[in-house]
Amino acid sequence: MDYKVSRSGEIVEGEVEDSEKIDLPPGFRFHPTDEELITHYLRPKVVNSFFSAIAIGEVDLNKVEPWDLPWKAKLGEKEWYFFCVRDRKYPTGLRTNRATKAGYWKATGKDKEIFKGKSLVGMKKTLVFYKGRAPKGVKTNWVMHEYRLEGKFAIDNLSKTAKNECVISRVFHTRTDGTKEHMSVGLPPLMDSSPYLKSRGQDSLAGTTLGGLLSHVTYFSDQTTDDKSLVADFKTTMFGSGSTNFLPNIGSLLDFDPLFLQNNSSVLKMLLDNEETQFKKNLHNSGSSESELTASSWQGHNSYGSTGPVNLDCVWKF
């Protein structure tokens, strides 16, 4: 499914007329205002239940604990957005059931009015998550902003129960100073390692490009951990598991995407630093001269010796 951005600001699935498309430069983030959430996302969702947005997931807040929500989200590092259907505490009442297995969401403060121009279009409620059961629950740093339609956008042909049923929830975790905390979360549950590697196995990594491996890396990941993991995969492919060889096989090196190596210098530098340390250690233990050991290793690995010189300039630019 293709994702398009219309001039109205919606990031939606499906086709958009060419005249309506806009291009966003790299670095743009999904950070809508309260009014934009109401106008461009919640209202279309209430009118059409099939409406979806690339940046907003769908979740049942009564079945998911707040610390598990980042894994359910589509995008986000500091805050996560969801379409939610509010569960009624009583079938004939209007009170919302805000309990989960581990605790409950409790409203705090006064609801904030949201205006489009001079017209009231929605309301924002702030809630805090408590572990345990009321009234002895323990307050946590998980906060939720819940957006609902109101005023101008409270559609006349829907009952009060129906129009309030669908809301947008923005969830985030705060520090002790009240600022939003950046959270680097791992792969979602059941995807703790690459399905690509599990299905093919380490022995079949040779001939695989690093670009291919990267296609399975989640956006919610720690960069340092990713670098170390990629180095491990890189070394396994080039040297083989448990190998003591000091120089890479040129054929294996050429299997990797040089643009990736050029643009991800930290991975290559970690690999080279590690190999240099190992080289010196083995050189010291063997008592061989550096020139003898280098020449011997090179001859044992150079399977492309008859093809002439190989240009690896793009690999070493870091």
UniProtKB/Swiss-Prot annotation:
Biological processes per GO annotation: leaf senescence; positive regulation of DNA-binding transcription factor activity; positive regulation of leaf senescence; response to hydrogen peroxide; response to wounding
Origin superkingdom: Eukaryota
Induction context: Rapidly and strongly induced by H(2)O(2) treatment in both leaves and roots. Accumulates during senescence and in response to wounding.
Residues of the DNA-binding region: 121-180
InterPro entries linked to this entry: NAC-dom, NAC_dom_sf
Domain NAC intervals: 24-174
Deletion phenotype: Delayed senescence accompanied by a small delay in flowering time.
GO cellular component: nucleus
Subcellular localization, as worded in the UniProt entry: Nucleus
Tissue and organ distribution: Mostly expressed in root cortex, phloem, atrichoblast and quiescent center (QC), and, to a lower extent, in root endodermis, xylem, pericycle, columella and lateral root cap (LRC). Expressed in roots, cotyledons, very young leaves, senescing leaves, mature flowers and pollen.
PANTHER family: NAC DOMAIN-CONTAINING PROTEIN 59 (PTHR31744:SF209), PROTEIN CUP-SHAPED COTYLEDON 2-RELATED (PTHR31744)
Function: Transcription activator that binds to DNA in promoters of target genes on a specific bipartite motif 5'-[AG]CGT[AG](4-5n)[AG][CT]ACGCAA-3'. Triggers the expression of senescence-associated genes during age-, salt- and dark-induced senescence through a regulatory network that may involve cross-talk with salt- and H(2)O(2)-dependent signaling pathways.
Protein's UniProt name: NAC domain-containing protein 59
